[in-house]
């Protein structure tokens, strides 16, 4: 059956459903009402080899902020659910993704300790109708709710679409690396302490 997470999140602003399978093949069915976000989520599924289903309705007649953030929250929660106690995973992941002139580095740790260090310099304020300041908000929401330590670095790039897409591709590959099972660890917790904080807990 594989490692799976399913979240249904309802607020006064949005309703979001997320299902993720970590041991998938990259199947993706996404409809958030935010076209550019949908495009990026397809990159996440395809390059991470995650099976991903996301549906969202929200107050996009105002702007995309609430939907973007709540999709990130629900995705992070689903990811944390699928990882459970993180037993047997590699835990760390790192990837540098090029897209034409853009080059973005992502390093992450499924540590249970949320932190985001983000240094994308996206020239355009919007890509299509998508406000580029929402890119950071999305990753902060995912990391906080999945318990990820996440570092995102732009090494090169001038085209806004290329920079953001390279970021999502690098995140996908780093997350795939970190969440895959390490056959040498078998069922062990990947920590010298013998425990990792699960998403939503503190310690």
Swiss-Prot record:
Cell compartments where the protein resides: Cytoplasm
Keyword field: Amino-acid biosynthesis, Cytoplasm, Histidine biosynthesis, Lyase
Record carries keyword Cell membrane: no
Reactions catalysed, as given in the entry: D-erythro-1-(imidazol-4-yl)glycerol 3-phosphate = 3-(imidazol-4-yl)-2-oxopropyl phosphate + H2O
Main localisation: cytoplasm
Annotated Gene Ontology cellular component terms: cytoplasm
Enzyme class: lyase
Database matches in InterPro entries: IGPD_sf (IPR038494), ImidazoleglycerolP_deHydtase (IPR000807), ImidazoleglycerP_deHydtase_CS (IPR020565), Ribosomal_Su5_D2-typ_SF (IPR020568)
GO biological process: L-histidine biosynthetic process
The keyword Lipoprotein appears for this protein: no
EC number of this enzyme: 4.2.1.19
An MF annotation (GO) of this entry: imidazoleglycerol-phosphate dehydratase activity
CDD domains recorded: IGPD (cd07914)
Pathway: Amino-acid biosynthesis; L-histidine biosynthesis; L-histidine from 5-phospho-alpha-D-ribose 1-diphosphate: step 6/9
Family (UniProt): Belongs to the imidazoleglycerol-phosphate dehydratase family.
Name the UniProt record assigns to this protein: Imidazoleglycerol-phosphate dehydratase
Species in which this protein is naturally found: Synechococcus sp. (strain RCC307)
């Amino acid at each position: 059956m594989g490692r799976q997470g399913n979240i249904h999140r309802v607020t006064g602003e949005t309703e979001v459903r997320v299902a993720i399978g970590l041991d998938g093949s990259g199947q993706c069915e996404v409809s958030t009402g935010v076209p550019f976000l949908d495009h990026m989520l397809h990159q996440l599924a395809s390059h991470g080899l995650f099976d991903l289903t996301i549906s969202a309705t929200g107050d996009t007649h105002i702007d995309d902020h609430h939907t973007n953030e709540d999709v990130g929250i629900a995705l992070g929660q689903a990811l944390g659910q699928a990882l459970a106690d993180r037993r047997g995973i590699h835990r760390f992941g790192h990837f540098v993704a090029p897209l034409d002139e853009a080059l973005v580095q992502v390093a992450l740790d499924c540590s249970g300790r949320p932190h985001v260090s983000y240094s994308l310099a996206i020239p355009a304020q919007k890509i299509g109708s998508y406000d580029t300041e929402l890119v950071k908000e999305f990753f902060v929401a995912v990391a906080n709710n999945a318990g990820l330590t996440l570092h995102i670095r732009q090494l090169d790039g001038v085209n806004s679409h290329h920079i953001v897409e390279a970021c999502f591709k690098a995140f996908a590959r780093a997350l795939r690396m970190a969440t895959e099972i390490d056959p040498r660890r078998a069922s062990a917790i990947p920590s010298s302490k013998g425990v990792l904080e699960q998403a939503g807990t503190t310690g």
